[in-house]
Curated annotation (Swiss-Prot):
SUPFAM superfamilies in the record: P-loop containing nucleoside triphosphate hydrolases (SSF52540)
Entry GO terms, CC: cytoplasm; mitochondrial matrix; nucleus; perinuclear region of cytoplasm; Rad51C-XRCC3 complex; replication fork
PROSITE patterns xrefs: RECA_2
Main location: nucleus
Domain of life the protein comes from: Eukaryota
UniProt entry keywords in alphabetical sequence: Acetylation, ATP-binding, Cytoplasm, DNA damage, DNA recombination, DNA repair, DNA-binding, Mitochondrion, Nucleotide-binding, Nucleus
Signal sequence segment: none
UniProt-annotated binding residues for ATP: G107, R108, S109, S110, A111, G112, K113, T114
Name used for this protein in its record: DNA repair protein XRCC3
Function according to Swiss-Prot or TrEMBL: Involved in the homologous recombination repair (HRR) pathway of double-stranded DNA, thought to repair chromosomal fragmentation, translocations and deletions. Part of the RAD21 paralog protein complex CX3 which acts in the BRCA1-BRCA2-dependent HR pathway. Upon DNA damage, CX3 acts downstream of RAD51 recruitment; the complex binds predominantly to the intersection of the four duplex arms of the Holliday junction (HJ) and to junctions of replication forks.
Length: 341
C-alpha cells in the first residue's frame, strides 16, 4: 500500500522512505523500537506512524448487507470470481466460480462436464480484467486419460469463444504449458497428490485452479457397502484438504462428480427426479456450490436435438436456477434467454 496515502507529517513519511520501507505492511511488521532505529524518528512520531498505518490498512466505515449485495463492500477481493468464459453462464453464477471453497459439477455421461472443466483451465490463465486469475491449473484425472486432443481444439478456438478478449492478449498466453496433469487411480494416490504435489504448484503461483475429474471414481472402486465408515473418513479428509488449499491460496476447486439413478424419494441435496450426485451426504457437506449438468436423452425427445441444462442445486450466494447450454467446437456456451429460477 502506498506510503503517500498516510495522513502524517511529510517529514515522517520521508523518514520512512529513507529507511527503505516500501509499504504500510512493512512498517507494521516492525516493532516500535525497530522503527526508531531504522527511521531515526522519536517515539511519539513512531506511535503516530503505527496508528496511521494500522488505520489505513484496516480501513474505515461500516459494511452493510446492501453493500455486499451490490458488491460495494470494503473487501472487493471477496467478490472476485473465476469466469466460465461465457457471459450467460457467468450471469447464472453471478460472475463465475467463487475462489474460496469446493464447487462440484455433477451430471450424466456426455453432459459436458469435462468440456466445462477444460474451458475453466483456459479461462483461469487470462488476466483478472478478463475474468481469469493469471495462472495455470492442476488437472487430476482419476478414471479416463486426459483429453489432450480436445484441449488443443479448445486452445485453437479461444479467439472465437472469447471475442471479448483482445487477440494480442490471447496470442501471448501459452495455454498448453500451464495445465499440470496428474493421474490418481486410487484414493491413496489422490490424497497424496492433493497433500504434496498440488500445494507446491499453488504456493509458487504456477496454478490457481484445481480440477479433480472425477472425485467419485476412486471411492466407488475401492469401497463396498461394508466399508462405508472408512469411505466417509477418507472423503472427509479429502474435502478438508481441498477446502484448506482453496482458502489458503484463494484458488477455486472444481470437482467433477458422477450421478446415480435415484430410486428413493428425492432428498435435499439431489438433483432432478431420477438423478442423485454420487458419494452421498458426507461429500455434499464438504461443498460450497453444487452444479448439475443435465442432458436430455434421445428417447425423452426423439424429434429434437438433445438439450443440455446447467442447474444451481445449492450455493450460499445463489438461488436455485438454471439455463440451457450448447457444446460447439470452440467450447461451452450458455443460450441467451433460457435462464429460469
Amino acid at each position: 500500500m502506498d506510503l503517500d496515502r498516510l495522513d502524517l507529517n511529510p517529514r515522517i513519511v520521508a523518514a520512512v522512505k529513507k529507511a527503505k520501507l516500501r509499504s504500510v505492511k512493512e512498517v507494521l511488521h516492525l516493532s516500535g523500537p525497530d522503527l526508531q532505529r531504522r527511521t531515526h524518528l522519536s517515539s511519539p512520531d513512531v506511535q503516530l506512524l503505527l496508528r496511521a498505518s494500522a488505520s489505513l490498512l484496516r480501513g474505515h466505515g461500516v459494511c452493510t448487507a446492501l453493500h455486499l449485495l451490490r458488491q460495494e463492500g470494503p473487501f472487493p477481493e471477496q467478490h472476485q470470481r473465476l469466469s466460465l468464459g461465457c457471459p450467460v453462464l457467468d450471469a447464472l453464477l453471478r460472475g463465475g466460480l467463487p475462489l474460496d471453497g469446493i464447487t462440484e459439477l455433477a451430471g450424466r455421461s456426455s453432459a459436458g462436464k469435462t468440456q466445462l472443466a477444460l474451458q475453466l483451465c483456459l479461462a483461469v490463465q487470462l488476466p483478472p480484467r478478463h475474468g481469469g486469475l493469471g495462472a495455470g491449473a492442476v488437472y487430476v484425472c482419476t478414471e479416463d486419460a486426459f483429453p489432450s486432443r480436445r484441449l488443443q481444439q479448445l486452445i485453437a478456438q479461444q479467439q472465437r469463444l472469447r471475442a471479448d478478449v483482445p487477440g494480442h492478449v490471447i496470442s501471448k498466453i501459452r495455454f498448453g504449458h500451464q495445465i499440470f496433469i496428474e493421474h490418481a487411480a486410487d484414493v491413496d494416490t489422490l490424497l497424496q497428490c492433493v497433500r504434496e504435489k498440488v500445494p507446491v504448484l499453488l504456493a509458487r503461483g504456477m496454478a490457481r485452479l484445481v480440477v479433480i475429474d472425477s472425485v467419485a471414481a476412486p471411492f466407488r472402486c475401492e469401497f463396498d457397502g461394508a466399508a462405508l465408515a472408512l469411505r466417509a473418513q477418507r472423503l472427509l479428509a479429502l474435502g478438508a484438504e481441498l477446502r484448506r488449499l482453496s482458502c489458503a491460496f484463494r484458488s477455486p476447486v472444481l470437482c467433477v462428480n458422477q450421478v446415480t439413478e435415484a430410486v428413493e424419494e428425492q432428498d435435499l441435496v439431489a438433483g432432478p427426479p431420477g438423478m442423485s450426485p454420487a458419494l452421498g451426504i458426507t461429500w455434499a457437506n464438504q461443498l460450497l456450490v453444487r452444479l448439475l449438468a443435465d442432458r436430455q436423452r434421445p428417447e425423452e425427445a426423439p424429434l429434437t436435438p438433445p438439450g443440455r441444462t446447467l442447474r444451481v442445486v445449492f450455493a450460499p450466494h445463489l438461488p436455485a436456477s438454471s439455463c440451457s447450454y450448447t457444446i460447439a467446437a470452440e467450447g461451452v456456451r450458455g443460450m441467451p434467454g433460457t435462464a429460469c429460477s
